[in-house]
């Protein structure tokens, strides 16, 4: 007679069940790790994408701001140029007091030089020398000669100092005016313009040398 089937061993079944459960747990853990890694990579990709988008927008806004600033500066410059030159200001007269004040400053800054007066030289020598220098003055009498010498002595005792002092006073008054009238000129151009005006100015001692000794002051 064949043996009767007695069924599966309970211990073997329990062991198989435990192995199956452990394998299922390991598989579930591995699957979870794979899913976590996937979503982690996806999050990084999304973050990088968002970061690049933000940086691109930031650069666009910066470029737009620079364009606006450049346009504003161009409009200001165009408006200033279209406005034309500043209103012309009437030339200010250099006064005798200003010239004398500049002369005094020059004299204080330089050593005092002793010069012979007309009293230390013969009248004829003074007269001839002054007539040669001035050319346009004629003295027919002793009184005229004294007048010529007095005027010449006052005007030309220190001609180089007087010229520098007069030009300094002229520049102090006229250069600010030229800057206001010609805001687009460089300083070198303004000084060239100032020299041209100085050559024609009645404040230039060289323009006063040819005046007759008895001309009204």
Swiss-Prot record:
Primary subcellular site in the record, as a coarse category: cytoplasm
Chain positions covered by the region annotation Disordered: 1-120
Modified residues (Phosphoserine): 136, 188
UniProt entry keywords in alphabetical sequence: Cell cycle, Cell division, Coiled coil, Cytoplasm, Cytoskeleton, Phosphoprotein
Localization per record: Cytoplasm, Cytoskeleton, Microtubule organizing center, Centrosome; Midbody
Residue ranges of coiled coil: 15-82
GO cellular component: centrosome; cytosol; midbody; plasma membrane
Bias (Basic and acidic residues): 18-74, 98-120
Keyword Iron-sulfur: no
Domain of life: Eukaryota
Record-level GO BP terms: cell division
Protein family according to the UniProt entry: Belongs to the CCDC124 family.
Cited function: Ribosome-binding protein involved in ribosome hibernation: associates with translationally inactive ribosomes and stabilizes the nonrotated conformation of the 80S ribosome, thereby promoting ribosome preservation and storage. Also required for proper progression of late cytokinetic stages.
Subunit composition and interactions: Associates with translationally inactive ribosomes in the nonrotated state. Interacts with RASGEF1B.
Annotated protein name in UniProt: Coiled-coil domain-containing protein 124
Gene: Ccdc124
């Amino acid at each position: 007679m064949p043996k009767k089937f007695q069924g599966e061993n309970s211990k073997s079944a329990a062991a198989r069940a435990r192995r199956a459960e452990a394998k299922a747990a390991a598989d579930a853990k591995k699957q979870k790790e794979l899913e976590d890694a996937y979503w982690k990579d996806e999050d990084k990709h999304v973050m990088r994408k968002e970061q690049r988008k933000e940086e691109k927008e930031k650069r666009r806004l910066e470029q737009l701001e620079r364009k606006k600033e450049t346009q504003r500066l161009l409009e200001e410059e165009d408006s200033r140029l279209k406005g034309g030159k500043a209103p012309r200001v009437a030339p200010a007269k250099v006064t005798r007091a200003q010239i004398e004040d500049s002369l005094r400053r020059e004299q204080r800054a330089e050593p005092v030089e002793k010069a012979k007066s007309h009293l230390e030289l013969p009248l004829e020598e003074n007269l001839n020398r002054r007539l040669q220098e001035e050319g346009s003055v004629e003295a027919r009498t002793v009184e005229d000669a004294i007048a010529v010498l007095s005027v010449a002595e006052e005007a030309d005792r220190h001609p180089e100092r007087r010229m520098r002092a007069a030009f300094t006073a002229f520049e102090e008054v006229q250069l600010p005016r030229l800057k206001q009238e010609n805001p687009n000129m460089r300083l070198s151009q303004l000084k060239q313009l100032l020299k041209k005006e100085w050559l024609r100015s009645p404040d230039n001692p060289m323009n006063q040398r040819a005046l007759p000794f008895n001309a009204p002051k």
